[in-house]
């Protein structure tokens, strides 16, 4: 039973995402591009394989969805290496944006406010978005204007550093504002 499953896996699951090369190409005719980029036009697959063998290189299917498929004569090992290297570089350059949260209360002291504001600036310098939430407890929710004033103080403290994605608005018992780093400043 285990052997049977392995055979099915090998048949249906591709081990890599690289294009087909040489004898794996199933088309009868291909649009051939030479090793230096010169176009040879539509050629029989056997002729294309012969040309690749004579050059000591591989025939690689570049665009399988085209009619006929586009194939290029090149060194397949080098092609795979460069593809992996490009993919690795692209992943390295990707920046995952994280949403950090900073919670405030309406009656926050000046020292705590400045500390939290400094921490928000650190998050923004790291390139993260920040969700600033103001939690109301009990009867504090009756004084929403205190929350609005607090958010105005936050905006003044972060002026020039941020782009406001979502202005202060109520969600249940909390007031929320979302800011992200301003690209112009960085």
Swiss-Prot record:
<dbReference type="InterPro" id="IPR019814">
    <property type="entry name" value="Translation_initiation_fac_3_N"/>
</dbReference>
<dbReference type="Pfam" id="PF05198">
    <property type="entry name" value="IF3_N"/>
</dbReference>
<dbReference type="InterPro" id="IPR019813">
    <property type="entry name" value="Translation_initiation_fac3_CS"/>
</dbReference>
<dbReference type="Pfam" id="PF00707">
    <property type="entry name" value="IF3_C"/>
</dbReference>
<dbReference type="InterPro" id="IPR019815">
    <property type="entry name" value="Translation_initiation_fac_3_C"/>
</dbReference>
<dbReference type="InterPro" id="IPR036787">
    <property type="entry name" value="T_IF-3_N_sf"/>
</dbReference>
<dbReference type="GO" id="GO:0016020">
    <property type="term" value="C:membrane"/>
</dbReference>
<protein>
    <recommendedName>
        <fullName>Translation initiation factor IF-3</fullName>
    </recommendedName>
</protein>
<keyword id="KW-0648">Protein biosynthesis</keyword>
<comment type="subunit">
    <text>Monomer.</text>
</comment>
<comment type="function">
    <text>IF-3 binds to the 30S ribosomal subunit and shifts the equilibrium between 70S ribosomes and their 50S and 30S subunits in favor of the free subunits, thus enhancing the availability of 30S subunits on which protein synthesis initiation begins.</text>
</comment>
<keyword id="KW-0963">Cytoplasm</keyword>
<dbReference type="GO" id="GO:0032790">
    <property type="term" value="P:ribosome disassembly"/>
</dbReference>
<dbReference type="GO" id="GO:0043022">
    <property type="term" value="F:ribosome binding"/>
</dbReference>
<dbReference type="GO" id="GO:0003743">
    <property type="term" value="F:translation initiation factor activity"/>
</dbReference>
<dbReference type="InterPro" id="IPR036788">
    <property type="entry name" value="T_IF-3_C_sf"/>
</dbReference>
<keyword id="KW-0396">Initiation factor</keyword>
<comment type="similarity">
    <text>Belongs to the IF-3 family.</text>
</comment>
<dbReference type="InterPro" id="IPR001288">
    <property type="entry name" value="Translation_initiation_fac_3"/>
</dbReference>
<dbReference type="GO" id="GO:0005829">
    <property type="term" value="C:cytosol"/>
</dbReference>
